[in-house]
Regions:
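C-terminal helix-rich "cap/oligomerization" subdomain common to oxidoreductases
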Residues: 1-4, 37, 73-75, 300-334
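N-terminal Rossmann-like dinucleotide-binding module
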Residues: 1-53, 306
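Rossmann-fold dehydrogenase core element
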Residues: 112-130, 150-154
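Beta-loop-alpha module in the N-terminal Rossmann-like domain of NAD(P)-dependent dehydrogenases
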Residues: 50-116
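Predominantly a Rossmann-like dinucleotide-binding segment in NAD(P)-dependent oxidoreductases
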Residues: 130-212
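Contiguous beta-strand/loop segments that form the cofactor/metal-binding neighborhood of enzyme cores
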Residues: 3, 181, 187-265, 292, ...
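Active-site loop of classical SDR/Rossmann-like NAD(P)-dependent oxidoreductases
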Residues: 15, 41-43, 240, 289-303, ...
């Protein structure tokens, strides 16, 4: 019988906290939530589309949470500005960690957390939300195998139409606006396809029509690399919403086009693949690849963390990739 991991869920304020706690409720064979730390007395900006449900769990103060030493893993789900402060505490203690994103408005605090986890040999999993996406994994493996040749362009968007006026103002509380908050998910994905250091980054930061000047809810960023380009964008007033989000990757021998990026309406997630040459059982031409029916955005990633902590699989963290993703994210603040 596999060990259930004693789990501290630190924070209720992150936008993903309601979804993460809901996923953990389903994974009782892997995780035993011993406490939820209530961070709501803090004043850091935050926004929730869904309420946080701590029913059935012991809710403790932050000071009480920090006194708890007998835990196997911590989920850091505070407001964005507080993530690295809490992550550093548990990295220094050598506790396995899932920490949500983004990783702060500077590189230094995040690099310190990474260095501590490396030195102590404990897992640090960042909550970029497409890491367990089956279509993204298919693309990553196919690109690595050379199916679509050398990558020349990659683009993605995280447009949406949810959130009231307070959400629009929330985007203005971040130096990098909506794209700092959401674009890091896209950069985590696209950086797997476009390698190297950008020679130039052009960022457009604006507001949707009718919104006030303090709002940063219409943004794009164009990254130029030797031999390739990358484009990410996000607007919170795009009526197509989540079901029109897209990732497209163009190579010298083919293209991947994923739209929507994810879906939880019971329908199949489908990836369009166009090949110039036959590969591994696929003929040249256009293919619609079924990636199955998604039921949970986060479960796959955090189940993997449980297996790593128990020693069932090797640690899958690629710290150099993660540091590069954060460096690309910080370009949005310039």
């Amino acid at each position: 019988m596999k060990k259930r991991l004693k789990t501290l869920f630190y924070g209720m304020s992150h936008e993903h906290a309601p979804g993460k706690i809901a996923s953990l409720r389903k994974l009782t064979d892997d995780f035993e939530i011993v406490a939820v730390a209530d961070d709501r007395a803090r004043r850091s900006p935050t926004y929730h589309t869904d309420p946080f449900d701590a029913s059935g769990y012991r809710v403790v103060s932050e000071s009480q949470a920090r006194e708890m030493m007998d835990i196997d893993v911590v989920f850091v789900e505070t407001a964005n500005r507080d993530l690295m402060e809490i992550a550093r505490i548990y990295a220094a203690r050598g506790v396995a960690m899932h920490c949500d994103k983004p990783c702060g408005e500077e590189m230094g605090p995040y690099r310190e957390v990474v260095d501590l986890c490396r030195a102590k040999g404990v897992p640090l999993q960042i909550g970029y939300m497409y890491r367990a996406n089956p279509a993204v994994r298919f693309m990553r493996e196919a690109v690595a195998a050379g199916w679509i040749g050398d990558i020349v362009f990659a683009e993605a968007d995280m447009n949406h139409s949810y959130g009231d006026d307070s959400y629009q103002h929330y985007t203005g509380t971040m130096k990098g606006g909506i794209l700092y908050n959401l674009g890091c998910h896209l950069l985590d994905t696209l950086a797997q396809f476009v390698k190297g250091v950008p020679t130039r980054v052009t960022t457009v930061c604006g507001r949707a029509p009718g919104d006030s000047d303090d709002i940063k809810n219409r943004m794009s960023a164009f990254y130029e690399f030797p031999g390739a380009e990358m484009l990410i964008r996000s607007c919170s007033r795009a009526s197509g919403g989540v079901l029109c989000r897209r990732i497209r990757v163009d190579g010298t021998k083919g293209t991947f086009d994923l739209c929507p990026i994810e879906r939880f309406d019971g329908g199949e997630l489908k990836l369009v693949m166009t090949l110039a040459e036959p590969v591994d059982g696929f003929a040249a031409g256009r293919h619609e690849v079924s990636c199955g029916v998604q039921t949970d955005r986060y479960a796959g990633q955090i189940e993997e963390l449980a297996a790593i902590v128990r020693g069932e699989i090797r640690d899958t963290a690629d710290y150099e990739h993660d540091l590069r993703v954060h460096a690309l994210t910080l370009e949005l603040l310039k």
